[in-house]
Amino acid sequence: MKHWKRKTSKEIQERIDKALGENSSFYDEPIIGMPCSYLDSKVFPHGNPILNNAPFLQTLINNPNHIGCHTVATSEITFSGTQKIERELLNIVACDIFKAEEGEFDGYVPSGGTEANMQAVWIYREFFKKNNGFSLDEIAIVCSSDTHYSIPKASNILSVQIHKVPVDTVTRQMSPSGLSNAFSELRENGVKGIIFVANMMTTMFGSVDKLDVITEALLESKLEFKLHIDGAYGGFFYPFANESNNMNFENEHVNSITVDAHKMAQAPYGTGIFLIRKGFMGYTHSKEASYVKGEDYTLVGSRSGANAVAVWMILSAHGPNGWKEKTHILKHRVDWLCKELDAAKVNYFREANSNIVSLSAACVLPEVARKYQIVPDDHHAPKWYKIIVMEHVEVEDLEMFLADLNIAVLQ
């Protein structure tokens, strides 16, 4: 690991202090030209003792705006210190987790996976239009039927047609023939450019799309394509649970990756990560943002620098070995759960190396689902309920659930 090192609490505090010191201060400097300030002082007083030894809260109250994309262009000098923290974070995630070459990627910290996925579709839509001369009718998003709803949302907002490939109900995988048929149908309808979204752990099942099958079908189709990985859920889990996976930038076909830090990384909500190979952010360059130093390339515009700092702090506190240990503890709990479900003859789906277990709705009474707040695939007509083993889910919680589940099964 070149960039990712474990740090002590003191080292983290000192690094954030340095970053905030490099930012301009709304408390101490005559900044009169910007539509931003520190957080409201009547509610969030600067001298509150709660801020002592609390670097995230200190950053939050200073309220840095990380507008723009700091890997592409110059940025507002007002927040240069915390922008460096964001770049350090992106180096950790891009290079040390997703195996990008240093300096060969761009990215930023968006509001979450939905925005990051939308950013990818927006970039590739503009790429196909400007680089290939394709019309909107000649561009299509392709994904599995298990893909997150942010992709249909991106299709709607960006006016790019979408084609969902069915999955096998047992394996949750798209078949080679299903992919080939989808590409043939699209080609016959005049589509020339494919934005393919592959899943690194789907939201409902934790299933992982097989990239080799997808890329083989894409190459055989002779269609132009860009491959985006939606790792919003799995990005901070799957690379550590399955270190031999090929969903990273060492795979020449992978062009961009979405990760959500407010899921498995347990960062504050409104925190994702978007990564893409160098040379593509420019397709969404908003030159009209001429009053912003470096202008803008992102969907969201203004965004909190405190969120980037929070993720950097979390990863730094654990370090790579601590993160692997955390992942394997959760995976071990899921292994135990699945053995118990097998013994009880409960029908479920679990992707190998996943911490999501989806139970057949026929095995789950509504009162059990309510008690444990397990989530259905459809609140109107559920076929599956999912269990997600997060850090707070102990084996004792699972034992209690299994006891109630077994009573329901016997009934």
Feature annotation, model-predicted:
Residues 1-104, 384-385:
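N-terminal entrance/gating region of PLP-dependent enzymes' catalytic architecture
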Residues 4, 8, 49, 74-85, ...:
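Catalytic cores of large soluble enzymes that bind and process phosphate-bearing ligands
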Residues 86-93, 116-125, 151, 311-315:
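Buried hydrophobic packing segments
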Residues 108-285:
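Conserved PLP-enzyme active-site core in the AAT-like
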Residues 137, 286-301, 321-411:
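Conserved C-terminal alpha-helix-loop-beta "cap" of PLP-dependent enzymes
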